[in-house]
Amino acid sequence: MAGQTIIVSGLNPAAILQSTIGGGASPTAAAAENGTRKVIPLSRDALQDFMLSIITQKLQDEKQPFYVLDLGEVVSLIDQWKSALPNIRPFYAVKCNPEPSFLSILSAMGSNFDCASRAEIEYVLSLGISPDRIVFANPCKPESDIIFAAKVGVNLTTYDSEDEVYKIRKHHPKSELLLRIKPMFDGNARCPMGPKYGALPEEVEPLLRAAQAARLTVSGVSFHIGSGDADSNAYLGAIAAAKEVFETAAKLGMSKMTVLDVGGGFTSGHQFTTAAVAVRSALKQHFDDQPELTIIAEPGRFFAETAFTLATTIIGKRVRGELREYWINDGLYGSMNCVLYDHATVNATPLAVLSNRTNVTCGGSKTFPTTVFGPTCDALDTVLRDYQLPELQVNDWLVFPNMGAYTKAAGSNFNGFNTSAIVTHLAYAYPS
């Protein structure tokens, strides 16, 4: 790995990483400058020390929350994807987390991008990414966004209604279309997509005919089984349904479909392993006769979730008997909005930099039933209840792992707490 070149926003830190790995330098001794961005090479178990160095060196006065993005984790996840689904091109769902350094390394490692709005397209293009690496994967778009896509050359989009056909015919007739279908089984996902998007079986032929009458090219089919812990078996039925759409288009005399978009719903770990097996099996069963088929996907949380760690400061404390109540400087109106909108469960680890510097993780310490509140004035802003934590003090820190998916991207500035201002620090942790 030491000889591999990693590009981050035009940065090539390979030589500096080599000096750390091969030259015996301390984990934080080498940094690659790129404007105001640095990439710190680390061993896998040095991330905690890196966060402590940020806290002690940079945040003495203003103890603001911050993220650490582990680019090594991103590279590992991309390698896992290529190994498990080598014939499926990932189009990363920008809405999940648009951190620019994150997008840059995804791009450098070969990922393309799923954008849902003009703003997301503009953002991706601003990083120097070609428009032919973007799918405009929003089945219902404002006309102004369609006009913009035509102007900049984003020529692949999704639809699931006749009105969308009319808008595209009027403003972007050169665009190729993917018919978004609704899977009959959403996989019991935390965030199902079916109630809002996707053509029903009886709507497929009329929608194909509408595009045909408008002289638009329908290049293929897309679907999304839903986001977060979805049952991988949902891919089986969805891919079978997609094959039926291909066959219907052929019966209508339409041009041969060449693209299948299997959507998102992938989560790193065991779920991804089982999902990859299901997808490969279904593709072999239904599309083995089309070796020229281009297969794409729209993973978001698979790449983002485990790559980001959030560090927050304890700004307030209250003791009520055995109960410990802490206030931190991020919450449900900020990064932890995922608890409400993504139905996520967050976990906290202490960094007792003030009260227990010799044992910052408080290993072996007595724990107490704990409530953790966010900083806003809304009582809804409660991050954790009935959680076990050791005794902590104001200006100690709580660290939240796996905070890359639908966190900062969906945060607000409610009560003046500016989620968009939270800084992301870059590290590259090599496998142990």
Curated annotation (Swiss-Prot):
Q: Which positions are annotated as binding substrate?
A: Y341, D342, D378
Q: Name the pathway it acts in.
A: Alkaloid biosynthesis; nicotine biosynthesis; Amine and polyamine biosynthesis; putrescine biosynthesis via L-ornithine pathway; putrescine from L-ornithine: step 1/1
Organism superkingdom: Eukaryota
* Keyword annotations from UniProtKB, A to Z: Alkaloid metabolism, Chloroplast, Lyase, Plastid, Pyridoxal phosphate, Transit peptide
Q: How does it assemble?
A: Homodimer. Only the dimer is catalytically active, as the active sites are constructed of residues from both monomers.
Instruction: Spell out the subcellular localization from the entry.
Output: Plastid, Chloroplast
Family membership: Belongs to the Orn/Lys/Arg decarboxylase class-II family.
GO BP terms in the entry: alkaloid metabolic process; nicotine biosynthetic process; polyamine biosynthetic process; putrescine biosynthetic process from arginine, via ornithine; response to wounding; tyramine biosynthetic process
Q: What is its EC number?
A: 4.1.1.17
Q: Which InterPro entries match?
A: Ala_racemase/Decarboxylase_C (IPR009006), De-COase2_C (IPR022643), De-COase2_CS (IPR022657), De-COase2_N (IPR022644), De-COase2_pyr-phos_BS (IPR022653), Orn/DAP/Arg_de-COase (IPR000183), Orn_de-COase (IPR002433), PLP-binding_barrel (IPR029066)
Its catalytic activity? Answer: L-ornithine + H(+) = putrescine + CO2
Pfam families, from UniProt?
Orn_Arg_deC_N, Orn_DAP_Arg_deC
Give the first-level EC class, as a single word: lyase
Protein name, per record: Ornithine decarboxylase 1A, chloroplastic
* CDD domains in UniProt: PLPDE_III_ODC
Q: Which GO terms describe its cellular component?
A: chloroplast; cytoplasm
Source species, please?
Nicotiana tabacum
